[in-house]
Amino acid sequence: MSDAPSLHTIRPCLEGAIPAVMATCDPDGTPNVAYISQVVYVDAAHVALSFQFFNKTRQNILRNPRASVLVLDPVTAHFYRLHLLYERTEDSGPVFESMRAQLAGIASHEGMAEVFELKGADIYAVERIESVAGEGLPAPAPRSGLLHTLRLCSESIARCTGLDELLQGALQGLQDKLGIEHAMVLMLDASAQQLYTVASCGYATSGVGSEIRLGQGVIGMAARERTPVRISHMTHAALYSHAIRESMDAHATPDAPALRGLDIPYPGLPEPHSQVAVPLLSAGRLLGVLFAESPQDMRFGFEDEDLLVAMAGQLAAAIDLLQASPDATDPLPAISAAPP
């Protein structure tokens, strides 16, 4: 049995806390080494690297598709080397949009929003991973009780018999069991291509009825691409948060009465440092988005995202079921779900 690390075991290295180092060669064997801002987990056999510049690294990869990337665990200070094979570049779709949202957060954090522009997500097959010899710190104990926490949230959702009880119970579960103080649920009006807030917690005002367009900010991007979007570095009005308010201000005019909800204040934090948005999907249809944020950097890791995705799946199925029930006593305002 191989002792080589897997992508899953080194996922803390792929959280974007520390830039990676990428080595490539041109056809005559001349090496090139460069820093790269993003190495993103795609699946158990693939990673995505950010393509931002038409530089020597890009030229080499197009001529010689093999590369090695050195990543660092930000907690243990242990290095790992990934041996990669370039497969393709994506300039749209879930992986690209998720990386673009993350990069916007990094850009704002570093004050380089104009420089950090994502041109594509380069998809690489991971041929092997090696642990680099050297001293490091002991690995922390794994987070315990996550599966039990998910069970408690699941049981709470399963007991709900009405939509309002369901939504409030889900948000209460985030607060009580996950320590997530600021969250909201938004539902989709497919005919208007808008998401509107139906429940929230942790804000000065509920913001119920406030709207976000598909593709707008972290929430709108998660909905449009039907993929989780998570940003861990955001400071002083990062692109993906204040763009929402600015856009709402631009549209909330007397000449735009049809834009229902744009006069209702959006309830988000004024300066979030971490955000995660997860689509609510049921039977392949988009119903809405579960969103959480925090004033702390790095508040939501990949384990939090995994748990929220699992919770969102059950929440969406429950919303679907209760809306279809003839006994529903508190239906949400007319929701038109997007087809698969």
Regions found by a protein language model. Give the residues of each.
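Short hydrophobic/glycine-rich mini-motifs in sensory/regulatory modules
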Residues: 280-290
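Signal-transmission linkers at sensory-effector interfaces
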Residues: 134-163, 321-338
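Amphipathic coiled-coil signal-relay and dimerization helices
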Residues: 32-35, 193-201, 210, 231-232, ...
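Regulatory sensory and allosteric helical modules in signal-transduction proteins
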Residues: 205-268
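Short, structured beta-strand-loop surface elements
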Residues: 56-102
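Amphipathic alpha-helical coiled-coil segments that mediate homodimerization
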Residues: 149, 153, 162-181, 185, ...
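A short, aliphatic-rich beta-strand micro-motif
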Residues: 255, 263-265, 273-281
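Regulatory loop-to-helix N-cap segments in sensory/regulatory domains
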Residues: 270, 287, 293-311, 318-327
